Amino acid sequence: MSKIVVVGANHAGTACINTMLDNFGNENEIVVFDQNSNISFLGCGMALWIGEQIDGAEGLFYSDKEKLEAKGAKVYMNSPVLSIDYDAKVVTAEVEGKEHKESYEKLIFATGSTPILPPIEGVEIVKGNREFKATLENVQFVKLYQNAEEVINKLSDKSQHLDRIAVVGGGYIGVELAEAFERLGKEVVLVDIVDTVLNGYYDKDFTQMMAKNLEDHNIRLALGQTVKAIEGDGKVERLITDKESFDVDMVILAVGFRPNTALADGKIELFRNGAFLVDKKQETSIPGVYAVGDCATVYDNARKDTSYIALASNAVRTGIVGAYNACGHELEGIGVQGSNGISIYGLHMVSTGLTLEKAKAAGYNATETGFNDLQKPEFMKHDNHEVAIKIVFDKDSREILGAQMVSHDIAISMGIHMFSLAIQEHVTIDKLALTDLFFLPHFNKPYNYITMAALTAEK
């Protein structure tokens, strides 16, 4: 029987552990260490919880220590790993305040990522704290269950008068939180160093639609501004950028995450951003040591190269692949396209692959084709919304590199999966134009926006 130690029980770790226990539990001894007090919190639901769009946090957990141990794992919670001797194959962790050593034959990192702390005057992390607490009161990070719970508890305390909130970071998390706070009746300003929201996921003509959507719902946008300082006497009073000052009661820092790979200790090869560099089996530069989820690289099929794309969906898939290989059952990942989506005030946006800007930066002779139309025929009077689509492709190979869609019709969310597969399988824009897509008025048009975008593509 092989002994496998897993460091981290986040999404990737939980997927990995469950895969091993469900498929190869009789063949392996599974030992898990996690520095947190809970397992499997769905951070993607954090904004829904804060914005009171769901009843509570209970549904945001799908596993726990008891469930994993019932399947046969040994799980140590609140137990940070302090060091790893890769030659002796021994993990040293802090368990109940004491040093604990655990040998292994295979090791899997699922250490995830940590919030980026931008160089802002007046903001520091409390030293020795594992829950990302800031030294200035009401400066909040958003990563863990505890972070969301703290924000909710503070907002529920009416004596604090937390009515004005600044969200720093215009990515998915920042935009979702801005909506959540506005839904609570707060005065919200969204600040980002770039001049648009959702930068990197969509081209600017699409991001402008979301920007207008936010402004239409009373969220102030302070884009193209660099945060210089957060000031206050013990607690937040104002946020200072290079262009203006905002009187605020709370600041949410949501500027992104970096891979948590401190345990590499100079012994494991890292990617340019510090992530564990892994192959398609999720194996690192040390044989028998694997890394899954946000702490590891992925193979980007659109770029045809190694990349870093931190998404829960990627975490689950890489966790499954890592589990199979750590258990001695060879399985290669097929790469990713970075498929993603967001829904804000009923405006749904989905994308996969590369934006036009990113495709050109990656060296492609890229161009785009697009189309705007109703989802269904004009005679369908109810629930018939406009859809905008953009397809990015390479003019030389004609291969599809990316796609973006936006609509108030949530049906577009399923269409992006087809484009994800198209990128994975190197489908050309010309083949897409003749792909068999069904027609029924309840769903779409005979010449639907996908077909029309492909048919009108530059030859």
Swiss-Prot record:
Assigned keywords, A-Z: Cell wall, FAD, Flavoprotein, NAD, Oxidation, Oxidoreductase, Redox-active center, Secreted
Predominant cellular place of this UniProt entry's protein: secreted
Residue positions binding NAD(+): 173, 192, 201, 256, 310, 341
Amino acids binding FAD: 10, 12, 34-35, 44, 81, 110, 113, 143, 172, 294, 311-313, 439
Gene: nox
InterPro entries in the record: FAD-bd_OxRdtase, FAD/NAD-bd_sf, FAD/NAD-binding_dom, FAD/NAD-linked_Rdtase_dimer_sf, Pyr_nucl-diS_OxRdtase_dimer
Cysteine sulfinic acid (-SO2H) modification, residue list: 44
Thylakoid in keyword set: no
GO cellular component, one term: extracellular region
Lineage of the organism: Bacteria, Bacillati, Bacillota, Bacilli, Lactobacillales
Cofactor binding annotation: Binds 1 FAD per subunit.
Protein name according to UniProt: NADH oxidase
Null allele phenotype: Not detected on the exterior cell-wall of mutant R6 strain. Attenuates virulence in mouse BALB/c intranasal infection model. Significantly reduces number of mutant WU2 strain bacteria recovered from the nasopharynx and the lungs in a BALB/c mouse intranasal infection model.
Documented applications: Shows antigenicity in humans and elicits protective immune response in a mouse model, thereby suggesting may be a future vaccine candidate.
Source species of the chain: Streptococcus pneumoniae (strain ATCC BAA-255 / R6)
Location in or out of the cell: Secreted, Cell wall
Presence of keyword Oxidoreductase: yes
